[in-house]
Amino acid sequence: MKKILFVASESVPFIKTDGLADVVGSLPKYINKNNFDIRVILPNYMSIPRQWKEKMLYRTHFYMNLNWRTQYVGVLEYQYEGIWYYFIDNEFYFAGNKPYGNIYEDIEKFAFLSKAVLTCLPVLDFRPDIIHCHDWQTGLVPVFLHDSFQKNEFYHGIKTIMTIHNLKFQGVWDKKTVQDITALSEYYFSPDKLETYGDANYLKGGIVFSDYITTVSDTYAHDITMPFYGEGLDGLMRARSDCLCGIVNGIDYEEYNPEFDPFINKPYNAKNFRKEKIKNKRALQQELGLAKDDKAFMIGIVSRLIDQNGLDLIDCVMEDICAEDTQLIILGTGKDRYENLFRHYARKYSSRVSANIFYSNEQSHKIYAACDAFLMPSLFEPCGLSQLMSLRYGTVPIVRETGGLVDTVEPYNQHESTGTGFTFKNYNAHEMLYTIRFAKEIYQDKKREWNKIIDRGMAKDFSWKTSARKYEELYESL
């Protein structure tokens, strides 16, 4: 039986800021327990809700050197849904009301986490065959493993996998500070290792020293070898392309199930959605103060309101989107520019636009269930989970052809009656607007055809089962 250790900065249900937490919290449940002993290690943030902290049990503690610093390392544990979770405790690094702070704080925080993870393994009497690292916050794990820990026989032969959820975020800070924090020698700060334009890059270190690299979709794995999407690391990704693959994320089909969803007004399934789904639309219209109109084309957006997600395209044609027979519901927070944009239009067209400038898991479920279409015009999208959730709920995605959206949404072809959503290729506001109008035309004038699109989308399997089998094959190969 192979032993696998997930190392990450967040995981549902304990702490979440984005889709990384969904992946780390869901994937281990679907790995075959007969062949793999899989465990997860996370920071014990002060911001983790009390309901979870009360269930954690003290396991051990020790003191660890981080260069000239001597730091306390506590380890707590909790078994959730059959998976053992370990929590690295240190009030200096993990205090505060949110998991991430300024980059200069996080650089030291996650260097501490990476070294503490490796240091605690003999104390826990758990020697993983593979350490599976997620994003830049864990990028130093393979680096430390290659450096000082190789002097200890316990660590010999441990393999590492680096999963890139978003190459844009790399954990870059000045070399001198990182050297002071990590005590890594000058050997590690060359252009073929951690150094990037004179600074130190945590994610680059993880990519260089990992045994294998994965991204969260096939298309994104190809995209990041190109300059436009490579975020300055495209050369490195090409150099390591023989150890790089894309595995599409899944979603938790137990949580995202319209037939048994406790958050939605009227449960439904692939057989009865034609009659029952509309009841969720009516309920959400009433809840949000929108016009009660069954024929209105209701579009949902659940997103961080940032440039990466294509909000500038929506800004360009917002007036056109807010047509008489269209309703738009937004859920999320982000840049002031976009928050204020949606607030403005919600005031201007109060019966057609609802701006919910916050995040609520319950509200997101209601939007997936109630809306007719779901808009994701991303500039780039490593994988994307929202389109998978919308397909699961029979809400037709309208997406730009990039990254994981290419791999998961099949473009509608009216001549062949195929496809699960509507797509557009170029990052262009009017091309997006044309696609929205085309989707609305099918919805309003060809309802039988629209329902067939929903049928095909709801029949797709984007659960973690398929993705988990691919990860199992990768684990076995290392």
UniProtKB/Swiss-Prot annotation:
InterPro entries noted in UniProt: Glyco_trans_1, GS/SS, Starch_synth_cat_dom
Its top-level enzyme class, in one word, is: transferase
Q: Which residues make up the binding site for ADP-alpha-D-glucose?
A: 16
- Reaction(s) the record says it catalyses: [(1->4)-alpha-D-glucosyl](n) + ADP-alpha-D-glucose = [(1->4)-alpha-D-glucosyl](n+1) + ADP + H(+)
Under the heading SUPFAM superfamilies, the entry gives: UDP-Glycosyltransferase/glycogen phosphorylase
Q: In which pathway does it act?
A: Glycan biosynthesis; glycogen biosynthesis
Q: Does the keyword Iron apply?
A: no
Q: What is its EC number?
A: 2.4.1.21
Tell me which Pfam families the record gives: Glyco_transf_5 (PF08323), Glycos_transf_1 (PF00534)
- MF terms in GO: alpha-1,4-glucan glucosyltransferase (ADP-glucose donor) activity; alpha-1,4-glucan glucosyltransferase (UDP-glucose donor) activity
Output one GO BP term: glycogen biosynthetic process
Q: Does the keyword Phosphoprotein apply?
A: no
**Similarity annotation:** Belongs to the glycosyltransferase 1 family. Bacterial/plant glycogen synthase subfamily.
Name the HAMAP family on file: Glycogen_synth
The role this protein plays is: Synthesizes alpha-1,4-glucan chains using ADP-glucose.
Q: What is this protein called?
A: Glycogen synthase
Taxonomic placement:
Bacteria, Bacillati, Bacillota, Clostridia, Lachnospirales
Gene name?
glgA
